[in-house]
Amino acid sequence: IRQLAFGDAFTTYVGQQFESICMQWLMRMNAERSRLPFLATRFGKWWGADPRRREQTDIDVVLADPQTKRVLLGECTWRNSFNETEAVEALLGREGLIPGYDDTRFMVFSKHPMSNATRDRYAGKVDFVTAEELYRR
């Protein structure tokens, strides 16, 4: 019974809530004009067909300003371990899926800090935020 209550279903539920927490943090940072590369006027998530991969995909958090044609795409990962490079590359591969934006920024939210190697590899391309950072002032 414990496995049923705290197994995959629980992890999936917490992962979905983590996406909501990440969006709330982004909205707060936007309101404070802090930590974000632009002032967003639209917030949400995206799902649809990726014509390059010929599959359905989603983007966990999306912030946009249609007037300046800037968009931020975010991945929210609530797992103890995962392939960091694969997750970041998948997010980078989603650039261009939302038409009408010329400047795309990326942010990865994770339960635990990304490795230094991953942070160094994607420095300047991707911002990384941990669950702990979401609650700092």
Regions found by a protein language model. Name each.
Residues 1-137:
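A cross-kingdom feature that marks ATP-driven nucleic-acid transaction machinery
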